[in-house]
Amino acid sequence: MLRQDGADGRSLADYVAPGDYGFDSPAGMFAISVHETHPAGCDCPACSMEYDSLLNRSLRLTLAEAASGWLDAELEKQLPNGSPVKIVKPAAGYASCPDHSLKRDILALLPDGDQLDIRLTESCAMIPDASICGLVFAHPAASYPEIRRLPAEALDAYAALRGFSPEDARLFLSHLR
């Protein structure tokens, strides 16, 4: 995982839960996807409006976020009452987890992940766009550390650990330079 540059130097790896937290795993992964019901189009009266595609996309994005909210609630139910543990779900490609290529790993490692039918573009944009994938951490100090800029040495070391080619390093990490 990438680590912030500077005094705090926080990383999501700092929030891997110790075994005594009561979870089966010290960290987790998730993926959510909402597909169109009529991807080729439909000729029913409700689908003939000009704004149908915008409405459809808006609904799918809202459903994906609602599913993520449901997952939050389900995970929090697993915590004992009064637990100081916080649960964070950083999505791959966002400021806490800025490497979009982690989506490949998450989708490959999830049991039955292929049944979600999420496809990735060369730059790891998700199709359908109403898809979310990320990591799950449970820890009392859990937060979303923002990683916006890193020194070249840190990026080069991370690229080497991930086994990136120079092209992949440019594609997935250049925004952090």
Predicted regions mapped to residue ranges:
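Active-site loops and adjacent core secondary-structure elements that bind or stabilize anionic groups
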Residues: 1-53, 87
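Compositionally biased, low-complexity/repeat regions
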Residues: 76-161, 166-174
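Structural beta-strand/beta-sheet cores of well-ordered domains, especially the beta-sheet scaffolds
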Residues: 25-30, 59, 133, 162
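Generic structural signal of hydrophobic/aromatic residues within well-ordered alpha-helices
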Residues: 12, 40-43, 55, 71, ...
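Conserved structured core elements
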Residues: 6, 24-26, 53, 57, ...
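Conserved mixed alpha/beta catalytic, RNA-binding, or beta-rich assembly cores of soluble enzyme
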Residues: 33, 43-76, 144-145, 158
